[in-house]
Amino acid sequence: MIRKTLTILAVSCMMYSCATKTESNPFFTEFQTQYGVPSFDKIKLEHYEPAFLKGIEEQNQNIEAIIESPEIPTFENTIVALDNSAPILDRVSAIFFNMTDAETTDSLTALSIKLAPVLSEHDDNISLNEKLFKRVNDVYQKKDSLNLTSEQERLLDKTYKRFIRSGANLSEK
């Protein structure tokens, strides 16, 4: 609990220190182009960090809503909700990591190094979230009775295995 509180505090402080206007950061809204592709001419180095931090905050809020839901875990309210929990983080990650792979600069590399522990901790906080795993596991255990499409089965399987491979089902020993 203390770790989670400190993480939220650290992310909030980082967001405050690198805040940019919402309307000026292209990652904060869906791309307004004909096919929804990124407007690379509008993306600047200073947009990445605030977008990552806001994306983390957004996903944390969405995950909190999933785990606090009084409804019985279902494919829709747990698996689909989790898959759709990070629109900003998904947008900024897709572009940032493609840019660092294809056209990196010293500034992008430095930012990647700075963000790596923040993103790693965020991923750990999701993968090791006991309440979230319980909901995912509840859906997974009744998968044969859910009449899922092959795409839905694949999403459920990938989601469940991500938690298992990250150690969610390990004992405290």
Task: State the predicted function of each range.
Residues 1-23:
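Bacterial Sec-dependent N-terminal signal peptides
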Residues 18-173:
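Zn2+-dependent metallopeptidase catalytic domains
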